[in-house]
Amino acid sequence: VSKLNNYVLPETITITNDIKEVCADKDLIVIAIPTQFLNDVILQMKPYITTQHLCIATKGMENNTCRFCHDMITSQINTTRIAAISGPTFAIDMINEVTVGLALGTKNEETENIVKKAFCNNFLKLRVTKDITGVEFCGAIKNVIAIAAGMIDGMNLPESTKAMFITESLHDVSELLEIFDGNKKTILSFAGFGDLLLTCTSPKSRNFSFGKLIGSDADAETIEAYRKNTTIEGLYTLDSIHQFGQDKHINMPIIE
C-alpha cells in the first residue's frame, strides 16, 4: 500500500499482523507474500486453518527445492482447498478498475466458486484451469525472462531483438513446463503469454526495470540500491531454477 501513491484504504479493510485474526472465521485467505517468507508464515497459520480456502497470489518458487507455493503449503497443511491466481495486471490497475484478465488454477470446484465470487466483477475476468502447477510456474518464470528483456531494453537494442527473445523464451518455457508436470497449453493463458507480454514490456514491472538498469550500464551502487528497496522475484526464481537444471542436467538456454 505504501508504494501506491495517494491511495487510501477503504474503511472495510483492516491492517493487522495478528495471524489468528487473519485466519479465524474466514471463507477465503489470499496469500500474497514473498516466497522466501512463505514457509514461516504458513507454519504460523497452520493452527488456525480448518475449512478455509487458500488462494495464492505469490509468484515464485522455494529456494533450493524449486517447490511451488501450493506444494509448500500442502506439505504443512492437509488441504485440497487451494488455488493459484496469476496474470497480466498491476495493483494500480486493479485499484483503477481497468479491464484485466487472470488465470485461476485449482482442482477444487468449491474453491473455484469461492474465488470467483470474491474476484469476478465488471472489470476482472477469470479463466479457470486445473493446471495449478502451470499457473504458478508461468507466474514465476516470467519474472526471470523480464529481467533479460529489461537488459535488452537497457542496451537500446531494437524492438525486433526483444520480440525474438520473448518468442524464443516462450518455446523454452513450454519445454520447462512439461518437465515440471504442467500443461503446455497453460503457456497460452493469462498466466503465461499474457503476463509474460506485460512484464517484459512495461516500465511498471520491477523485474523489467531492474534488468534495464543492468543493461544501461548503471553504476553498481544504483543497481544495488534498487535491488534492496524493491522485491525482485525473478532473482530468487533464477537461482532456484538454475540449480534445478544443473542437478537434473537439463539444458535451459533462457536461464543460462
Where are the regions that the model predicts?
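Internal alpha-helical scaffold of NAD(P)-dependent oxidoreductase catalytic cores
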Residues: F37, Y48, S75-T80, T99-K185
